[in-house]
């Protein structure tokens, strides 16, 4: 019975190779039982995703408050509530995919909503963190020896706002977008086209052009957003795009690549997956929670810009170098 339950659980995962330890051992099993529960209630996966968006966005209200240093125990508990709400949002966001695989209710809209979920959480969170810094900044001012005047507070908040905008739109968004793409590439190499969601902007553009505007304006807006999302993924991985193009030209489809080519790509991808996992929710939010609880949310922006930025650059360059090496081997007669 246990083995049967385990097999059913594993069937709802994309692959154990793309999950980190916490996801595979704790979060995904919880999500499986939630998925079974929602399936019995006939709840659609997209409804679960939308619920996660609202819950994650609501957590921003609690992160607005200073933690123990500034607001004592009440502030600490408010931040802990924010942490719990964001964890629930992530739990639901993970459940939607397992529910879709369990019930067969997969859709392009579900993929689009899943990609949007994190942004709907962190846009309000980052906005309110700017206001939080304006209210509570004596720790940073004390360390830097800055007089705590209204003028200095406004100037410092303007700097933090610039950091938050850059961190959110130029770092977190692209980092998670690239991490998601590398997961889909790994699944494509591991399971082929049917086992991955490796979409191309060309395919999405075709779907957009073939969809009539009448009565589909909202859907076309979602498609347009997803086209932009996939195009940015492709622009970040030129060597991989060239490799896929060559494989299609030589073998009719990238999925028909020789086994030795697939294994070489998988070997390099398996090496990168644990590092790639650091760009996804668990590690990123673990650090975010820590910085908020110790009353240093400013450090989160610097961490994303510097530490995760350098990690993303390294992963991208390593993967691109691998794709270039494999492409040159395939080109050689």
Predicted feature residues:
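C-terminal membrane-associated helical module and adjoining short loops/tails
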Residues: 1-30, 181-333
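Small-residue-rich segments of transmembrane alpha-helices in multi-pass membrane proteins
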Residues: 54, 58, 113-128, 191-201, ...
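Membrane-embedded alpha-helical segments that form the functional core of polytopic membrane enzymes
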Residues: 45-109, 122-126, 150, 157-170
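Cytosolic-side membrane-entry/anchor segment at the start of a transmembrane helix
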Residues: 6-23, 27-29, 33-41, 90-130, ...
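Select subsegments of transmembrane alpha-helices in polytopic membrane proteins
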Residues: 45-53, 114-122, 273-282
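Alpha-helical transmembrane segments
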Residues: 130, 147-186
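Juxtamembrane membrane-interface segments at transmembrane alpha-helix termini
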Residues: 64-67, 92-94, 174-178, 314-325
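Structural signal for membrane-spanning alpha-helices in multi-pass inner-membrane proteins
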Residues: 56, 60-64, 125-132, 292, ...
């Amino acid at each position: 019975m246990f083995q049967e339950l385990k097999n059913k659980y594993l069937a709802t995962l994309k692959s154990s190779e793309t999950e980190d330890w916490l996801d595979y051992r704790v979060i995904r099993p919880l999500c499986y039982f939630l998925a079974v529960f929602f399936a019995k209630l006939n709840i659609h996966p997209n409804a679960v995703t939308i619920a996660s968006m609202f819950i994650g966005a609501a957590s921003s209200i609690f992160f607005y408050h200073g933690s123990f240093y500034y607001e004592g125990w009440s502030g600490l508990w408010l931040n802990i509530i924010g942490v719990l709400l964001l964890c629930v949002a992530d739990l639901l966001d993970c459940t939607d995919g397992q529910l879709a695989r369990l019930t067969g209710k997969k859709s392009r809209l579900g993929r689009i909503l899943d990609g949007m979920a994190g942004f709907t959480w962190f846009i309000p969170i980052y906005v309110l963190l700017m206001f939080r810094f304006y209210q509570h900044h004596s720790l940073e001012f004390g360390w830097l020896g800055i007089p705590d005047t209204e003028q200095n507070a406004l100037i410092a908040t303007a700097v933090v706002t610039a950091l938050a905008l850059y961190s959110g739109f130029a770092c977190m968004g692209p980092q998670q977008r690239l991490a998601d793409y590398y997961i889909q590439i790994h699944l494509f190499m591991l399971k082929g086209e049917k086992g991955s969601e490796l979409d191309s902007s060309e395919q999405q553009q075709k779907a957009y052009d073939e969809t009539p505007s009448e009565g589909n304006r909202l859907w076309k807006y979602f498609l347009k957003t997803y086209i932009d999302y996939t195009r940015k993924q492709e622009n970040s991985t030129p060597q991989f795009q060239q490799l896929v193009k060559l494989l299609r030209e030589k073998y009719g489809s990238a999925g028909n690549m020789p086994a030795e080519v697939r294994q070489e790509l998988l070997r390099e991808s398996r090496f990168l997956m644990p590092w790639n996992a650091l760009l996804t929710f668990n590690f990123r939010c673990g650090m975010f929670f820590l910085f908020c609880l110790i009353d240093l949310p400013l450090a989160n922006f610097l961490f994303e810009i510097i530490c995760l930025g350098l990690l993303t650059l390294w992963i991208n360059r390593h993967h691109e170098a691998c794709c270039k090496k494999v492409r040159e081997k395939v080109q050689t007669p």
